[in-house]
């Protein structure tokens, strides 16, 4: 029941997000492409494509790689580090800045949406079953 309510809430927020593809960039200068936040799971650049560079939990450029620079909860470049000083940014294809993708609730200009807030709270469960969560959220 709880999962159904969360899924419904996510669907409502996705209507507005689907209008613009959101891109994730990480690294000290935010010049490392980390994938598309709201692309479908068949897009080769989607963070939801578990077989692609940005969705694989084994890829060095994936936020789902718990041992990697961009996916470890201990890395300052990871969205999952609650104390990250340089988390990834979310921008659109025109370069418009939406905010930082981070679990750090105290960082200035944190990107906050229902989808991102949900991902930041449940990233471990999502990482372990990416395709099922994609189907639930989208």
At which residue positions do the language-model features occur?
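Sec-dependent N-terminal signal peptides
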Residues: 4-15
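Repetitive, compositionally biased segments used for assembly/scaffolding
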Residues: 18-138
């Amino acid at each position: 029941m709880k999962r159904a309510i969360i899924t419904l809430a996510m669907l409502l927020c996705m209507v507005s997000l689907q209008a613009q593809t959101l891109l994730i960039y990480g690294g000290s200068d935010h010049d490392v492409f980390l994938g598309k936040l709201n692309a479908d799971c068949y897009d080769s650049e989607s963070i939801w494509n578990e077989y692609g560079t940005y969705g694989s939990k084994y890829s060095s450029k994936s936020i789902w790689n718990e041992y990697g620079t961009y996916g470890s909860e201990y890395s300052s470049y990871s969205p999952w580090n609650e104390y990250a000083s340089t988390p990834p940014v979310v921008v659109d294809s025109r370069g418009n800045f939406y905010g930082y993708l981070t679990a750090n609730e105290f960082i200035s200009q944190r990107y906050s949406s229902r989808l991102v807030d949900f991902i930041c709270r449940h990233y471990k469960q999502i990482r372990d079953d990416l395709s099922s969560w994609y189907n639930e959220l989208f």
